Amino acid sequence: AELTPLDTTYEITEGNNLVSWPSHSSCSVGDAIPDEFEENICGVIGEGVAAIPNETFGWVGSLQLFQDGKGYWLCSDVDMYYNWDAANCEGTLSRKAEQSAAIPSGYEYKQSTEQAFYFIESIENIEMGDWILSYNDDVVIGARQWSGEITDVPTMGDDGSEYTKGYIKSGVAPSFKILRGDELINLEGDIPAFE
């Protein structure tokens, strides 16, 4: 398949913009986004993965590598002309994205075209290996294993398809639970509405 040329310039508007990764080589988020644009990028979302900039840790979240043939939603704070630093990654060994741990049986969910991510910095008494589950009423709409650092929890919305019936709608706040072994622990907090 033909890729977008490496020197493609995108006209980015404030908000979310769909862009493609123009290289056969995978590239880390921090290497792929040129330094001169980083302060204007508020996040990047892929299929079930996301990353946001963090002043202390750099790029955090489950999106570690941009991959050949994939599209991404790039969130910008401003209108700008943008280009990837894909040449920075050319000729390097193609790395594979880390595979996420398999979601425990009974807590699976379907990918939706309507998705949001909740970035969680800390939870009292959470342990490595625990899962953070997002819910709409009693329907599981997302899951991510706690990584010990800032963890992005995907939350799927109702996109009108049969697969997402019962998923969350815009303006409603999800609930979150910790899954530890077979035990579900409700989480309390000020949770923003799904958008």
Annotate the PLM regions.
Residues A1-E195:
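N-terminal exported-region signature
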